[in-house]
Amino acid sequence: MQKILIAPWGNFSSWKKVIYSFNGVEKESKSSLSAIYDKINPDKVYILVLDTLSNLESENYGDIVKEVKEKTENFIKENLNIDNYEVIVCPGVGTFYNKDFEKYFKFYGNLTDYYSFALYELSKRLDGDLEVHLDLTHGLNYMPVLTYRVIKDLLEILAIKNKVRLVVYNSDPYVGREKEILNIHTVEDVIIKPSYDIKGMTLDFLDATKFVDKKEIGKIKKEINMNPKIKELRIMKQNINAFIASIVYALPLVYSTFFVKKDKIEIYLNELIGAFISNIKINPEDKILKRYLYFGEGFNSLVKAYFASKISEIPQLIKDELSLEEIDELKNTLFKENPNSQYIKNEISSLYNIINTKYKEEELSEILGNWTPIYKIRRENIDKFKIRNFLAHAGFEKSVTEIYISVENKNGKIELSEKTSLRYNKNYIEEKNGIKRFIFKYKDKNGKVEEINILEKIEEILLNK
């Protein structure tokens, strides 16, 4: 299990050396990170700092990030004996007096952009079985609570498939005495349980802040709306939400058929990040930084969809059909802790029961070697689609799902084999330019055909849960 140490930092330029005491380790240092690092020996360290540490001497935001990163790295090299670290520069807000310039530096934007940006950056770096150590000692104002929320949100998704432990630290407050001993306390030490409560993705990825000149708002929004990748993302919305729903509601066939790969989602995320950064305006003379855009909940949900895709992908199970054996594998891995997995067990047990007790050998021979609608196997009529019914049957709704029966001889009796496969009726699946649609064509008793967009129904219930 890999050990990761994460720490949000405020302005480290004024930190003084003290003695930090942690579980038998005493370390004289300007940061609590030193003692924790020596004790736990992490594989990787991530330090989150704010762009508010910049001197704002360039109009280019890339220069601002580079400046802050170099400033932080120099502090680490000069004061802390740690290796294998990475500095992540996040957006910050506030007004700060800079003694060197004898001037107030002003950073305007939305405070929650810190959460969104840190969520995005850490989602790319966390994976596998993890032991995450979070040191909140040096976080400024909103940083500790938002960093904790980021870590918790990501780890609860990571725990769907991995073993995850979270340990949180904070030290005694520094009161200005030289050589004083500050104890580092363990605030929390927990095994993270998986959360399947992932929100569906809405279209509020980016919006204009109140700091934009009114005459610029229309231009900025048009720029976002006309962006080809963001336009494509809007079209992909139902596919992404179908994938999220497959995890939330434990729907094996929806997972395998409508899985959206992390690489595809990452392209959209990078495009949104690019739009966000390109609309940061800096006035080096007046020392003012303004963010014209802020991240909405749609962006946060997209990051979580990316992370869920990253941790949940089982390549051999991303396909249009699944055997009963493969469905059981999903039930015991991705959906192991999901309360909705009971529906999977019920449906598969029902199929075994129907085939093994209600079909004679000669009847089975007539349907072997063909894909057969489940409603016919159940000797029932096709029904109009109802989303609640779809979820209650783990996505194996009889009117849209087909079965390819395989049998085996058990003690002289022909029974259903775990090699039996399920899929959605191919006549209802459409794909164009990488976008899938799931359209059920239902004919009522009067012969009238109604087309039902199943992904739309899945999305509606996900967004309204």
Swiss-Prot record:
GO terms for molecular function: endonuclease activity. The keyword Transport does not apply. Keywords: Antiviral defense, Endonuclease, Hydrolase, Nuclease. Pfam families: Csx1_CARF, Csx1_HEPN. The RNase activity is stimulated by cOA. GO terms for biological process: defense response to virus. The keyword NAD does not apply. CDD domains: Csx1_III-U. Its EC number is 3.1.-.-. CRISPR (clustered regularly interspaced short palindromic repeat) is an adaptive immune system that provides protection against mobile genetic elements (viruses, transposable elements and conjugative plasmids). CRISPR clusters contain spacers, sequences complementary to antecedent mobile elements, and target invading nucleic acids. CRISPR clusters are transcribed and processed into CRISPR RNA (crRNA). Encoded in a type III-A CRISPR locus. Homodimer. Belongs to the CRISPR-associated Csx1 family. NCBIfam families: cas_MJ1666, CRISPR_DxTHG. This is CRISPR system endoribonuclease Csx1. The lineage of its organism: Archaea, Methanobacteriati, Methanobacteriota, Methanomada group, Methanococci.
